[in-house]
Amino acid sequence: MCGIVGFTAPGQDPAAAKQIVQGMADLIRHRGPDGEGCYADGTAALGHRRLSVIDLAGGGQPMLNEDGTLVVVFNGEIYNYKTLRARLQQRGHKFATDSDTEVLLHGYEEWGRDLPCRLRGMFAFAVWDRKRGTLFCARDLFGIKPLCYYKKGETLLFASEIKAFLAHPAFEKRLNEARLPDWLSMEYLPDAETLFTGVYELPPAHTLTWQAGRVTLARYAAPRFRAKRGRSLRAWAREIGDAVAESADAHRIADVEVGCFLSGGVDSSLITCEMARRQPAVQCFSVGYAEEAYSELPAARAAAQALGVPLTETTVTADDFFAANRAIQWYLDEPMPNPAEVPLYFLCKAARQRVKVVLSGEGADELFGGYPLYRQAVWAERWQKMPRAVRRALAALLPGCGLLRRGALPRWQRSARANYVFETTQERDKYLKRDYCAPTPAQRCKPYFDAVRGLDEPTAVQWVDWQTWLPRDILRKADRMSMAHSLELRVPFLDRQVLAAAQALPRRYRCTGRRGKIALRAAAARRLPPQLADAPKRGFPVPLADWLRQEKYYALVKAKLTGPAAERFFDTGALCALLDAHRAGKTNAMTKLWAFYCFIEWYEVYFTGKIPPDL
């Protein structure tokens, strides 16, 4: 795992370009403290920060091919690189290292732009082709590894993290304020835009090609649900269990020790179980709070005992939680008010003291139907099939029922993620100082739903999550919080082979109106004790709502909500009224308050403070 940066600027001075790209790489040093390198010529410059995990002595980057016509920088891991290496050797390619990076170089020579289709892994890479004058970039199928870009004239900037652009003189740092309403509603932007004007994320499963100042994006894979009928749950459980086991084994590849995150839930327990079969006494890590009602530690302890693995525990206090948020917003690049990022930050910090790589359970809910959102979609679909007269009668009888309200809307407007923080745009807009006249968040999500009109509702919601929520929230959080501590986090559920099983799974084995992850839990039951296979989903629960009612943290948050940054964007009187109502127990406004707090803290870090900040 590493950090990559680079840019194109035809006619540039190579020596000056080398200094600039070095400065860009320095801003993401946390992604790779083990080594650095840069390359520059009259058109392109590439930089790299290395976290050495495979081929510790070799594998330095940027890496050039034999005649120096190709230069590559790469972030991630290619789990089938040995298979690809053998195939390339059969075709006459000569290798100088044992690294997966060199496989990308020779793979590009052999297969060109079809290379990403052959890769099994998590990756973001860039290949500068001096002969053709093209820069070719690619991002993995799920968006596990980040890649962002910025174009100004003929100059293209790319990097693992947006903050690297701050070191380039062509970058104009401006807030993409028009998208603030969307962000407040969803806690992320569902498309490729970011909260920095002109900065975009390369979408998952896409390539980017720069040539002569022009940029072209192309999708190289499009995962689709194609259910296979006529198989029993037992057969599916066997296939899914085998796919997850094989993926966990593939994800072990490393020349350093690999550990596991263990929460006590079914996802992390299954991954840990497969690791422990091959690596007895695998180091496991969990995080929790002193407030036991919110802590995962008791469940993690029970799981560790059942699996026979050692567990390192980390406890986060309220002081820890608030003190770390400024650093967390810096590492995230864009504001993220998901409270789960804070315990994850401390969990990664603790794990890095013992191992360099961990396996984690992200992606299981999205692939196998684990979220309550999908079960709600089952009920919404049933509601739509009821006779209109029955629906009207029930709606009149239960006027306050959110499911019935949403059930009357078109599918794309029913998406709960579009109204995650605020029930309506009117409720949200009363806190904003100006009218942004923007499309609603649901309208932003409509193209994704339009692309899967033929799917049943819960399956369509899952697919939209794959394109939006998964890369823009779950995986961004996982990447940035682990890389903040130079820790490589791998996600065995997000694997091509596991995906093949998941997208063929009939809906009734993913979720019903009452249960989720049906086939995955059946697969887990073949390997885990019943209390782990049937463990309820917990996520990272936090006692933040309680803390916001305590004088110390109430005062801290109020100071932020009435400061100069808050005054610029928000009605601070309305914010204080919301905080007071929460403190008095009249409402639970934790999600809203934390969203405002995190945006303000992020804005202060990136737009009013020095770069890089003192952390």
Predicted segment positions?
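Short secondary-structure boundary/capping segments
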Residues: 329-330, 372-379, 612-614
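Short catalytic/ligand-binding loop motif for oxyanion handling, primarily in non-cytosolic enzymes
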Residues: 134-136, 145-146, 166, 366-370, ...
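Adenosyl-5′-phosphate
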Residues: 1, 167, 197-204, 214, ...
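Active-site adenylate/phosphate-handling loop in enzymes that bind or generate adenylated species
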Residues: 141, 346-404, 469, 474, ...
